[in-house]
From Swiss-Prot:
Presence of keyword ATP-binding: yes
Name by which UniProt lists this protein: UvrABC system protein B
GO cellular component, one term: cytoplasm
Record gene name: uvrB
Start and end residues of each UVR domain: 631-666
The organism of origin for this protein: Xylella fastidiosa (strain 9a5c)
Localization in the cell: Cytoplasm
Superkingdom to which the source organism belongs: Bacteria
Subunit relationships: Forms a heterotetramer with UvrA during the search for lesions. Interacts with UvrC in an incision complex.
GO biological process: nucleotide-excision repair; SOS response
Comment, domains: The beta-hairpin motif is involved in DNA binding.
Keyword Nucleotide-binding applies: yes
Length: 669
């Protein structure tokens, strides 16, 4: 089924938004390849893009710099387009250790990974939607530039079923097996099928809640229907249905056997090269490992690390780029690069890191040279494959400005009337004492403070010193994982502490209305953390509060500081003019803390993908439980925690993790 994008929202574009939407849409239809949407924090960039998508009515790919921001965007677009296909495409690895070889210590590290089945299902749903409908918006990370199966193979393998079609049951089962579906009569799970008389039930790999029931009679499809695999209740009847492969890497038996032959040819050629260089150990190692893989592929059609032979399986020439998610996009699609100042450099860096590791594996006989072609796209290859694009950022980089050739659409006015923070410059010599006095002023007002330093050591020392002065303070550093990071931000908003110190506080998720002061220590030390874009991004962290201020501690005004101050002042003036013209009185953004922490109340109802589960708080009196009861309670909570993590509900996962820790402590006590 395909339809039109229908934006659902309780408000309409205001401020700079109507003009921005009109310009972006007009330029898109005029064939302009690259545009920049320069939007300040809180100006409604996501809502603006949603309006553009509704007006141009083209399949859209939104790229974000990390999984956390991608999850936030996915949730927002899902709310804007509830009747359309909004999909999520990120790396499906919860944990990934690529295979590697360290020549200095003669250490080979085997590939080790843990795949998140829920995200794998969402990836499959994304590619199916791109191939089968036009009203599709996919939110992705740089995972989109990594190799996938070829779309033509993916399409040619699909099983198209129609009511009244003649198909023998054996033929149907054989086709499902070619799609890598497994037969399971006991438990119908994703990617499996079962046979009961003349009824074949299939749980599509990309489906979250519904399975397919195929009822045959005398070699003819008598009925097609979707049903709930848990209750067996029919959801709706169908006239037609397409079953897509269980994995993006599925291929035909003929293609696999053909690949085996070409791999043998490459092996023979490379072994001769190794023997010629007198690399006997490497040659023996390569022959043994590759021969084992070839036997597995010939017998079962698959082997561990089969992605290293993807060039042979797709029939590509040496050095040719692999098929990626961009090959699934139609030519007239729209590409949106969110936080482009971060995402663009990421895309350029992916290829080089992957290449250096694999070159070592090839050199020492762990892989054939064709493994080098299992790679992400080079930056220039990505540019060629990119459709018409919009770069979205508060601080676009030089690449975006150059590529857009002056097509920069500004989104500087916030509908809330909030003005960019006031900026003050104060001397470095007294920065710590002055900071303490400023923190105390904010605490009296019930506000929070963000402090950014240049090094980890400075952050640790400052945190320790301020803590000794009686200030409730926490330190955010790179070793903290996503869930714990969200928990720290939540605790700051809840007032469990007042000051958050970090090195690079530019990352998403730090837009908190409670923060009225951002302090930047050593602001005059030029470098990555004190560049113009970094300063603007950091200053913007206080842009959600009506009392927002930024203090730059510096003894001189650098070029980056001057540019950041001038740009912020320009934005302040434009917002003031808009407020005066429209009679708007700025008010701080009111964002309920329950939005961040559903678990602040007992017995919270959790919206988990329509499953309607209820997650209850654990009893406070843990000491009343015996060891067996504590162990049982911990097991139940762990299952709930992992489910929340799979559903991208990191705040709830963090809350339950805390409960498990308290239970563990009670058990030890």
């Amino acid at each position: 089924m395909t339809g039109l994008f229908q934006l659902v929202s309780s408000y309409s574009p205001s401020g700079d938004q109507p003009t921005a939407v009109q310009k972006l849409v007009t330029n898109f239809h005029a064939g302009i390849a690259k545009q920049v949407l320069l939007g300040v924090t809180g100006s409604g960039k996501t809502y603006t893009i949603a309006n553009v998508v509704e007006q141009i009515q083209k399949p859209t790919l939104v790229m974000a710099p990390n999984k956390t921001l991608a999850a936030q965007l996915y949730g927002e677009f899902k709310a804007f387009f509830p009747h359309n296909a909004v999909e999520y495409f990120v790396s499906y690895y919860d944990y990934y250790q690529p295979e590697a070889y360290v020549p200095a210590s003669d250490t080979f590290i085997e590939k080790d990974s843990s795949i998140n089945e829920y995200i794998e299902q969402m990836r499959l749903a994304a590619t199916k939607a791109l191939l089968s409908r036009s009203d599709v918006l996919v939110v992705a990370t740089v995972s989109a530039i990594y190799g996938l199966g070829a779309p033509e193979d993916y399409l040619s393998l699909r099983l198209i079923l129609s009511l009244g079609e003649h198909i023998e049951q054996r033929q149907l089962i054989r086709h499902l097996t070619e799609l890598q579906y497994t037969r399971n009569e006991l438990d119908l799970v994703r990617g499996s099928f079962r046979v009961r008389g003349e009824v074949v039930d299939v749980f599509p790999a990309e489906s979250e809640m519904e399975a397919l029931r195929i009822e045959l009679f005398d070699g003819e499809i008598e009925s097609l229907s979707l049903f709930d695999p848990l209750t067996g209740q029919t959801v709706r009847k169908l006239q037609r249905y397409s079953v897509y492969p269980k994995t993006h890497y599925a291929t035909t038996r003929e293609r696999t056997l053909s690949a085996v032959d070409t791999i043998k040819d490459e092996l023979k050629e490379y072994l001769e090269l190794l023997y010629g260089r007198n690399k006997l150990v490497e040659a023996q190692r390569l022959a043994q490992r590759t021969q084992f893989d070839l036997e597995m592929m010939a017998e079962v059609g698959y082997c561990n690390g089969i992605e290293n032979y993807s060039r042979h399986l797709t029939g590509k020439a040496p050095g040719e780029p692999p098929p990626t998610l961009f090959d699934y996009l139609p030519p007239d699609a729209l590409l949106v690069i969110d936080e482009s100042h971060v995402t663009i450099p990421q895309i350029g860096a992916m290829f080089k890191g992957d290449r250096s590791r694999k070159e070592t594996l090839v050199e020492f006989g762990f892989r054939l040279p064709s493994a080098l072609d299992n790679r992400p796209l080079r930056f220039e290859e990505w540019e060629v494959r990119s459709p018409r694009s919009i770069y979205v950022s508060a601080t676009p980089g030089s690449y975006e400005f150059r590529e857009s050739a002056g097509e920069v659409i500004e989104l500087l006015v916030r509908p809330t009337g909030l003005i960019d923070p006031e900026i003050e410059i104060r001397p470095v010599a007294t920065q710590v004492d002055d900071l303490i006095s400023q923190i105390n002023v904010c605490i009296k007002l019930g506000d929070r403070v963000l402090v950014t330093t240049l090094t980890k050591r400075m952050a640790e020392n400052l945190t320790e010193y301020l803590s000794e002065q009686g200030i409730r303070i926490r330190y955010l550093h790179s070793e903290i994982d996503t869930v714990e990071r969200v928990e720290i931000i939540r605790d700051l908003r809840l007032g469990k502490f007042d000051v958050l110190v970090g090195i690079n506080l530019l990352r998403e998720g730090l837009d908190m209305p409670e923060v009225s002061l951002v302090a930047i220590l050593d602001a005059d030390k030029e470098g990555f953390l004190r560049s113009t874009s970094s300063l603007i991004q950091t200053i913007g962290r206080a842009a959600r509060s009506v009392r927002g201020r930024a203090i730059l501690y510096a003894d001189k005004v650098t070029r980056s500081m001057r540019a950041a101050i001038d740009e912020t002042e320009r934005r302040r003036q434009k917002q003031k003019e808009y407020n005066a013209e429209n009679g708007i009185v700025p008010k701080s953004v009111v964002r309920p803390i329950s939005d961040i922490l559903e678990g602040a109340r007992d017995g919270v109802e959790v919206k988990s993908k329509g499953k309607g589960r209820r997650v209850d708080e654990v009893p406070a009196d843990y000491c009343a439980l015996n060891q067996a009861e504590i162990a049982a309670q911990m097991k139940v909570l762990e299952q709930q925690m992992y489910q929340h993590a799979r559903d991208l509900e990191f705040e709830d996962a963090a809350r339950i993790r805390d409960q498990i820790q308290r239970l563990r402590e009670a058990g030890l006590g």
